[in-house]
């Protein structure tokens, strides 16, 4: 039997490793400095539109900073044991936020565990968009005696739970129901307009208190979600190394720590070793060790890696693609980030052999590596320049790189990825093409046979 994975930490302090049989644990030294730094409003958000700098306090910091959730728990049927972990922060009342689909699938398992132990639980239904209008509506539905906010679901639900918790000065517990991104662990939320356009980032002084993952739920999700998470996580090491080389400020607000860098590298190594097996496990709905390892890589390692390392071109390219219309928006976050990672590799002038190795691994993971697979085979030069200009907005993470670019260079790199990838496909006889799904939320990806 695969035991639960546990990780306990206090944010922004030096790493101390602890061994524990059948579990993975790390602890961070505590200090009164957190209270002194942030004052009484421990959970007050810092709202900013700058993704690569965390508030004014951090811009000039050259200290090594490592930030993380207080605890990470991952295991099969973990939601049925919710009270065991929630009671550290709340024993009387909780708000559980999930969309209707997640309520139908698994969120009630958490409610049942809490209710059976005497807690009063308020169930809120997330409307689907992490906009200020929706967040204000949800905030008003939270009882005054709420002790903890629990977000169950995808990225926007998790971001909403973080925002509400911090606005109420309450601890937050984040329960991803897919391993499709590394958003769960971070101390930020992405805020959108009511019609789904990016509006701003909200940064918080502390990460979520608990990341709580039931892998029996994760493994029942369509394999496309796991693959998207792999695409997102593959960017972590590439972007972190770029940020370190340029000595830029990490999302944590200072210089990347050795721990952050090694976690990003461990994320890459774990994916290279286990991703293909995990994808096959997911197609059969079985929680193998490989599957558990990739869930941890997609969620914990990638989350700690990007926040303590930083973002660079890969995510900026993803954001830049919002400048054009069309089928590309049927792709999930990690699917677009994967292509953005290849663009960054071209911008950094990696050897063609290294590009081919990365592109081939992505293709084997059923990620898009050509413009046709992105759904934009006939994209025009002007549209690519629009992507380039959006990628280079002043607040974008591409400015964490040591080299500076112009829109034409971005457009050329996007086309170069398409050219190199097509050439690799021709030379190797690779015929398994990524098939653009009918919608962003469609579970269908391609025919993946175990």
Curated annotation (Swiss-Prot):
Q: Where in the cell is it found?
A: Mitochondrion
* Region forming the signal peptide: none
Q: Which reaction does it catalyse?
A: glycerol + NAD(+) = dihydroxyacetone + NADH + H(+)
Q: Which cofactor does it need?
A: Zn(2+)
Keywords for this entry? Glycerol metabolism, Metal-binding, Mitochondrion, NAD, Oxidoreductase, Zinc
Binding positions (Zn(2+)): 232, 315, 333
What EC number(s) does the entry state?
Answer: 1.1.1.6
Q: Where does substrate bind?
A: 182, 232, 315, 333
* MF (Gene Ontology): glycerol dehydrogenase (NAD+) activity; zinc ion binding
Give one Pfam hit by family name.
Answer: Fe-ADH
The reply to whether Metal-binding figures as a keyword in the UniProt entry is: yes
| Main localization (coarse) | mitochondrion
Per the entry, induction is: Repressed by glucose.
Hey, which pathway is this one from? Polyol metabolism; glycerol fermentation; glycerone phosphate from glycerol (oxidative route): step 1/2
Its GO biological process terms? Answer: aerobic glycerol catabolic process; glycolytic process from glycerol
Name the InterPro entries for this protein. Answer: ADH_Fe/GldA, ADH_Fe_CS, Glycerol_DH
The answer, when asked if Oxidoreductase is one of the entry's keywords, is yes
Q: Where does NAD(+) bind?
A: 99, 155-159, 177-180, 186, 188, 192
Q: Per the annotation, how and in what number is the cofactor bound?
A: Binds 1 zinc ion per subunit.
- Offer a single GO CC term for the protein: mitochondrion
NCBIfam families documented for this protein: PRK09423.1
Outline what the protein does: Glycerol dehydrogenase involved in the assimilation of glycerol.
The record's similarity note reads: Belongs to the iron-containing alcohol dehydrogenase family.
Name of this protein: Glycerol dehydrogenase 1
Where does this protein come from, organism-wise? Schizosaccharomyces pombe (strain 972 / ATCC 24843) (Fission yeast)
